[in-house]
C-alpha cells in the first residue's frame, strides 16, 4: 500500500456494518424538482423497523451496499445517494408501509428506461430484510422527461392518419390466436375491416411460427387492408407484430411493413424489452408508422398487491420509451382492473399534466410537458353488451379491441364487426344526445338491435356472459 493510499484510508473511514437508516433515512430532506421520486410498498421482515427497511431500499437502489467501503470517501454520497424521506403505514394492512424515496437525477442515463429500471427495481427486490416490495409509482421530473422522444406520433397524429374523429377506435384481435394459415388469417382480417372495424391485430403470440411465417402473414394482411379500404372508403390498419428473437430481425420486419405501405406495426413491450421498443419507436417516427404496444407478461410483474411493480409505472415507462397504443385493461372484461385505478393510469398515458390523487393510486403530480400521449387499448373478454360502459369509461381517445366478441358471432366472421360498429355508433350518438350511458346503456343497445339483425344476434349469444370477480388491484 502506498503512503498516499495509507493516508486516505486512515482519515474518516471506519470499516464495518452500520444501519442503513443512519445514512439513507433523511425525513427532513426537501425534494428537488429534478429528483426522481418513488413510492414503494414495503413489507419488512419481523424485527426490521420500517425506517430501516425504507432506508435499505434507498441505499441498495442507489449508492449503498451491505457494509461501509473505503471508496465512499472518493465521491460525494450526499450528492448521489438515494434518500428515504418519508414513511407511512398502509391502512388496513399489517406491517406494510409506503416508503418515499428521492433519487438524484445524475444517477440515471439520459433517455434510458432500461437504466432507470435497473437501478430502481433491481436487486433490491430480492433483499432478505424485506418480505415483499412493490413499486407503486414514480414521479419523473420534467428535466428527465425531456431526454426522451416518447411515442412515435401520439394521439392527434394517430387520428389524423386515420381521418377518424369523435369516437373511440374499434379493433379486433384475430382468433384463434395460433394455428391459422396466412391466407385464412388474411381472410379474417379482411372480413373484420370490411365489416366496419378500424383495426385488426396480431395476437402477441403470433411471431413467425411454422404454420404461418411472418412474411406470408404481412403480405396477406396488407392485401386485406387494401381491399377493405377500397370497398369502404375508410382508412384501415392491422397491427403487424414485428417482435422477433433479435432486434435486427425485428427491424427487418418493420422495414418490410413500411415497404408494404401499411399504417401500423406492433411490438411486445415487456417480453421484447424496453431497448427494442425504443429502437422500433425511433424507426416508426422516422418512417411514418404508428406503433401498437402489447403488454404480455405484465401480470407477472404487477398482479400481486404486495410485491412487484404497479402497471401505472409500466405505463409511464412505455410513454417515455415509445408507443402510440398500449393495452390497459377493460374494467368490465375478463382481465384484472378496478375502475378508478385503471382511469388513473389511463390519464397518465393520455394527459399532459396529472395531479396527485391517492384515491386513484396516483402518488405524485406528473408533468409530461410536450411528450405525446398514448391511446389506451381496452381488450380482453369484451362484447357488445359492454360497449356503453367502455365508451363511458374510456371516452373517445381509446381503442376498443374485441377478439372473441367479434369473431364469435353466431353468423360468422363478417357479421361480428358489423354488430360492434353498430353498437359503438349507437352509444356515441346517444352520448352526444345527452343520454347517460351508465344508466341507459342496455336500453340503447336494445334499441339499436331493432334495426341491426347482426347486433341482435350478438346480444342474444352474450346476454348472460359476465366476468364478475373482486379486483385484486384496489387502493387501500
Swiss-Prot record:
Its main location: plastid. The record marks 334 as: Transition state stabilizer. The active site is at residue 175. It comes from the Eukaryota. Residues 1-2 form a propeptide. The modification N-acetylproline is found at residue 3. Keywords: Acetylation, Calvin cycle, Carbon dioxide fixation, Chloroplast, Disulfide bond, Lyase, Magnesium, Metal-binding, Methylation, Monooxygenase, Oxidoreductase, Photorespiration, Photosynthesis, Plastid. Binds 1 Mg(2+) ion per subunit. The disulfide bond which can form in the large chain dimeric partners within the hexadecamer appears to be associated with oxidative stress and protein turnover. Substrate binds at residues 123, 173, 177, 295, 327, 379. It catalyses: 2 (2R)-3-phosphoglycerate + 2 H(+) = D-ribulose 1,5-bisphosphate + CO2 + H2O; D-ribulose 1,5-bisphosphate + O2 = 2-phosphoglycolate + (2R)-3-phosphoglycerate + 2 H(+). It is an enzyme of class 4 (lyase). Its EC number is 4.1.1.39. Its cofactor is Mg(2+). One of its GO terms (molecular function) is monooxygenase activity. The modification N6-carboxylysine is found at residue 201. Mg(2+) binds at residues 201, 203-204. Belongs to the RuBisCO large chain family. Type I subfamily. NCBIfam families: PRK04208.1. The basic functional RuBisCO is composed of a large chain homodimer in a 'head-to-tail' conformation. In form I RuBisCO this homodimer is arranged in a barrel-like tetramer with the small subunits forming a tetrameric 'cap' on each end of the 'barrel'. Heterohexadecamer of 8 large chains and 8 small chains; disulfide-linked. The disulfide link is formed within the large subunit homodimers. This is Ribulose bisphosphate carboxylase large chain. It comes from Barnadesia caryophylla (Xenophontia caryophylla).
Amino acid at each position: 500500500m502506498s503512503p498516499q493510499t495509507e493516508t486516505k484510508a486512515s482519515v474518516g473511514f471506519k470499516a464495518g456494518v452500520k444501519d442503513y437508516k443512519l445514512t439513507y433515512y433523511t425525513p427532513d430532506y426537501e425534494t428537488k424538482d429534478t429528483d426522481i421520486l418513488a413510492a414503494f410498498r414495503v413489507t419488512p421482515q419481523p424485527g426490521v423497523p420500517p425506517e430501516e427497511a425504507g432506508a435499505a431500499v434507498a441505499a441498495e437502489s442507489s449508492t449503498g451496499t451491505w457494509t461501509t467501503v473505503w471508496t465512499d470517501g472518493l465521491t460525494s454520497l450526499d450528492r448521489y445517494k438515494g434518500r428515504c424521506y418519508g414513511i407511512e403505514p398502509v391502512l388496513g394492512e399489517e406491517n406494510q408501509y409506503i416508503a418515499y424515496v428521492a433519487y438524484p437525477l445524475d444517477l440515471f442515463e439520459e433517455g434510458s428506461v432500461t437504466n432507470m429500471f435497473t437501478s430502481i427495481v433491481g436487486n433490491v427486490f430480492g433483499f432478505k430484510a424485506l418480505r415483499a416490495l412493490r413499486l407503486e409509482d414514480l414521479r419523473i421530473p420534467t428535466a428527465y422527461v425531456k431526454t426522451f422522444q416518447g411515442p412515435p406520433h401520439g394521439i392527434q397524429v394517430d387520428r389524423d392518419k386515420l381521418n377518424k374523429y369523435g369516437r373511440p377506435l374499434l379493433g379486433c384481435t384475430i382468433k384463434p390466436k395460433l394455428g391459422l394459415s396466412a391466407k385464412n388469417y388474411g381472410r379474417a382480417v379482411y372480413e373484420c375491416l370490411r365489416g366496419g372495424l378500424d383495426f385488426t391485430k396480431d395476437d402477441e403470440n403470433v411471431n413467425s411460427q411454422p404454420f404461418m411465417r411472418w412474411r406470408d402473414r404481412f403480405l396477406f394482411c396488407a392485401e386485406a387492408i387494401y381491399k377493405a379500404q377500397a370497398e369502404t372508403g375508410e382508412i384501415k390498419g392491422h397491427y403487424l407484430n414485428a417482435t422477433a428473437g433479435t432486434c435486427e430481425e425485428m427491424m427487418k420486419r418493420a422495414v418490410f411493413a413500411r415497404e408494404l405501405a401499411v399504417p401500423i406495426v406492433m411490438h411486445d413491450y415487456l417480453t421484447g424489452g424496453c431497448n427494442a421498443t425504443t429502437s422500433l419507436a425511433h424507426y416508426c417516427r422516422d418512417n411514418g408508422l404508428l406503433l401498437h404496444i402489447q403488454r404480455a407478461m405484465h401480470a407477472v410483474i404487477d398482479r400481486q398487491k404486495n410485491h412487484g411493480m404497479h402497471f401505472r409505472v409500466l405505463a409511464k415507462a412505455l410513454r417515455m420509451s415509445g408507443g402510440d397504443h398500449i393495452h390497459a385493461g377493460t374494467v368490465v372484461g375478463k382481465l384484472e382492473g378496478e375502475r378508478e385505478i385503471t382511469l388513473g393510469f389511463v390519464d397518465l398515458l393520455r394527459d399532459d399534466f396529472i395531479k396527485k390523487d391517492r384515491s386513484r393510486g396516483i402518488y405524485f403530480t406528473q408533468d409530461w410537458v410536450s411528450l405525446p400521449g398514448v391511446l389506451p387499448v381496452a381488450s380482453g373478454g369484451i362484447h357488445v353488451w359492454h360497449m356503453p360502459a367502455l365508451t363511458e369509461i374510456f371516452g373517445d381517445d381509446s381503442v376498443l379491441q374485441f377478439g372473441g366478441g367479434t369473431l364469435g358471432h353466431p353468423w360468422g366472421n363478417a357479421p361480428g364487426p358489423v354488430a360492434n360498429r353498430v353498437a359503438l355508433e349507437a352509444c356515441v350518438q346517444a352520448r352526444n344526445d345527452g343520454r347517460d350511458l351508465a344508466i341507459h346503456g342496455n336500453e340503447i343497445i336494445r334499441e339499436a338491435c331493432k334495426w341491426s339483425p347482426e347486433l341482435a344476434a350478438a346480444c342474444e349469444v352474450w346476454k348472460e356472459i359476465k366476468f364478475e370477480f373482486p379486483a385484486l388491484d384496489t387502493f387501500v
